[in-house]
Amino acid sequence: MTNGTIHNKDGFLNRIAERLGRNRRSAGVTVPDYIHQPQHRVYQGYTQDELVGVLKDHCRKIHTELIETDVIGLHDALYEQAARFGGGPVMIPKDDRFKEYGLSGLLTDKWPNEGTKVWEWDAAAGDENIQRAEQANIGVTFSEITLAESGTVVLFSSKDKGRSVSLLPTTYIAIVPKSTIVPRMTQASAIIKQKIADGDVIPSCINYVTGPSNSADIEMDLVVGVHGPVKAAYIVVEDR
């Protein structure tokens, strides 16, 4: 990852230390080694199948459909779920995994021949991508990391994978490779931290999406779809 340029770092940190009423500590500072770390014990030792069970249970609580399939069945599973959501237009990011998981025929042949519009995110198109996402009925993306505990999919945004794909369409479908499922936020943070340590290019935006958009006021009246899709579904697929 390219290193950025930091300006006025010392002056900024010295000012904070001064306001705290102490001298700035610039040496001998280490990350605390906490004795109690219960976050690592949640679902510790669970198999991928057991984590799928945890994910499935929580999806019921967040009003999200969960479908399980393999690579061969993914084409039909996505087609059928899209039909249950009312069909297209469909918005997708530019992602080679659609081809790798055997979905090219659906996206470039079957749906277009049926009159269903399929729009792929195009970095060169600028704001036109956002307009298409607003018009789309379904947004489809792959989950990078999936949190079983909360039913959350983690999305890495980039120039080819705009956040609007999963935010602006009326409904949303996440394709969840089974290997991406981890117990909770603890493991997701560790994965991202390791990517940084390895020098990988880090996404411009990392989003944690938990089912459809849900909002509630002080009277506990649930309102769905205010800040995102009205409905959501996860398709858990065995890895290739």
Curated annotation (Swiss-Prot):
SUPFAM superfamilies, alphabetized: NagB/RpiA/CoA transferase-like
InterPro entries given in the database record: FTHF_cligase-like_sf, LUD_dom, LutC, NagB/RpiA_transferase-like
Gene: lutC
Organism: Bacillus licheniformis (strain ATCC 14580 / DSM 13 / JCM 2505 / CCUG 7422 / NBRC 12200 / NCIMB 9375 / NCTC 10341 / NRRL NRS-1264 / Gibson 46)
GO-annotated biological processes: lactate metabolic process
Gene3D superfamilies noted in UniProt: NagB/RpiA/CoA transferase-like (3.40.50.10420)
Protein name as catalogued: Lactate utilization protein C
Disulfide partners: none
HAMAP family xrefs: LutC (MF_02104)
Highest taxon of source: Bacteria
Signal peptide: none
